[in-house]
Amino acid sequence: KEIFGSIDPIPAEIVYGLTANHWLTKLPFKIGIIGADKKLQIIKQLMEYQEYQDYLGLERFTDYIQIPQKFACDDLTLRLIELKEQIMNSEAEIFLLGVGHLRSGILSEMANMKDAVYLDIGSGIDALAGLIDGKRPYFGSWVNHRVRNIDLYNDVDLLQYESNKTHYLD
């Protein structure tokens, strides 16, 4: 109370629940996503289906800001330059990001790039790509939407994924 006044601290993992119950994607703001290139390609493909848009409660993501799936931290200076250019040219008012360890090197810099809300949804990016394990906290009732194009899923870095509650859109 002494530090926060009348504001109670909110547990950081609340963003997982807000992602899992689609609350974040139903916000009336322009939403962009920042994540691994391979996963964002899948999300883009899924967003072409009205059924998936309805599931999320979102017509579209305004921006897909991609980072390399692997070795994203190897050249932090380059990564920040690339991110800054894309973020400054984006329409988004809110960015949902799942960037793994890279977050440690970029989150403090992002507020200087553009006045927006940046929410680290972590494995929520995997959920949006239809790749979340239903045993992960908060995602027990999440339905993984997928397309049958197997090539789209080649070389995707999976985080403890076990196929469950999968629904194919095509």
PLM feature spans:
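Conserved nucleotide-cofactor-binding alpha/beta core module
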Residues: 34-90
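Gly/Ser/Thr-rich loops at beta-strand to alpha-helix junctions
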Residues: 36-40, 96-105, 125-126
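Electropositive, gly/pro-rich neighborhoods at or near active sites that engage anionic ligands
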Residues: 1-58
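Short, flexible loop segments at the rims of nucleotide/cofactor-binding pockets, characterized by
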Residues: 7-12, 70-77, 97
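C-terminal functional extensions of proteins
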Residues: 105-170
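Structural motif
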Residues: 30, 93-94
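Residues at the starts of beta-strands that form the adenosine-phosphate
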Residues: 30, 61, 117
